[in-house]
Amino acid sequence: MKFATSIVAAIATTGAAFTVIPQKLSHPSQLNALNTMGSISSITAESPKEVLSRVQDAGLTLTNPNDLYWMVDFLKEKYYDNGDYYYPIKTVCDGESIDVKFYCPFEPSLSPHYLELYGSRDERASIYETTMKKYNRINSEKTSAICTPYSSYGDTQIVAYFYSMMYYINDQTAHLKLPESEIESELIDILNDDILIYLNEFMSIFEPEDAQDLERIWDFLDFYQPYFSKVDGKIVLDEKYLVRTPSQMPLIKTICEYVSEQFAPSKNITQVIWEVVRYIKGVKDEIHIRGDKSFTLSLQEYDDFRDKVTASPMAHAVSDLTHERFSYEAYTNPAFMELENRCSEIITYFNDVCTSDRERLDEDPFNSVFILMDLDPSLNFAKSCDVVVEHAYNKMQAFLKLKEEILESASDEEERLALARMIKTREDSLIGYVLHEVCCVEDGYARDHKPLMKAFLEEEITKSLAEKVKFNPVESESVRLN
């Protein structure tokens, strides 16, 4: 299926950089499931011959948003379409070559809204208290577009905001990586105050119609309960804790306003609030864990910890609301929540391999690669990465088994279709994260730039495009006009 050109932003080229001029579009609340790759040339307005010439001259970048479409297209064609679900990751850790393959048996795709999201990034960055250098490294537009390929523009953007929220809170927790003597207690107090106020902002949009939903969130607050009260069917923070305005409050307000306006009137947003509570509680745990330099984690404890502080469950809870087929009851199904946790753990293990060198330099012990090396001193970085990838494969098998069990447990076809749609959201997130890591091809626009992956992709994509141009010379010239 081809996308109509009306949904594609016009592109203006200035030197090597691209600026997208957004059209006045009306963004529907729902996009039908589409295969973005089927209309790659209509989206980028480029022919294979043009792309081949550009890649040969300038290489692959992330500052030309078209390149991500062509990279995803290539990976889908070379791997998924041929039944090969093992995607290469080539990087280094402390000089050791890390050459592994991430197993992920789901179809790659990329949102047709990525061009417009990329083009409006300066406007989006103005919401944050940040620098463009830091904002570019986070590159949340890329993450959301590749992990949420079938949602509307606004719904894709809100996922980008959730990922940004995680990264900017992570920036504050990063202070705890310093030696104990260098940690400033005042900054930790500020972080504790900030996350409590962020949590309160989400509570302000939570107006459950069902008393059970109110109690579900109230009980889940756990050690945060003393800070809040139940007032007229709402959960309200005691005013004495509203001591300051956190730096990223405009971002949090933007997220809350969107959820409140777009979803709350017609859908049950309780799970979004639940996942935010889980995440904020996880950050509180992280403050404790990182602050105690003698603290160690087993691999299972690490899994449990990461289940809480991964952004994907928050993003999934929002994405679930964007689709017509939706079952709130799924969240009270232990098997479904176990599937959610497996998803978080797989993403974490993939991330650990890709961040191992950066986190080694940061002396950050909370990485499965390092935890395994502590458990088995015979492992070097490369071998430990191999073991982590094996663990990720096993977790993927558990994910697939849970998927079948959940679908078989559906009481009727309508429920089965709703569950299938919600599981698909998590599958899209998994393959999206893999592609996000594979396509880190430009320094400064990825947290973990991979020069070896860049060289590999440039060589392979050049060969692939050259074959297309050779065997379909007319099509390669004219496809952009179709």
UniProtKB/Swiss-Prot annotation:
It is an enzyme of class 2 (transferase). Mg(2+) 2 binds at E359, F366. Pathway: Secondary metabolite biosynthesis. Its EC number is 2.5.1.-. The gene is dabA. Can also use Mn(2+) ions as cofactors with a lower efficiency. This is Magnesium-dependent glutamate N-prenyltransferase. Its cofactor is Mg(2+). Changing Y167A: Complete loss of activity.
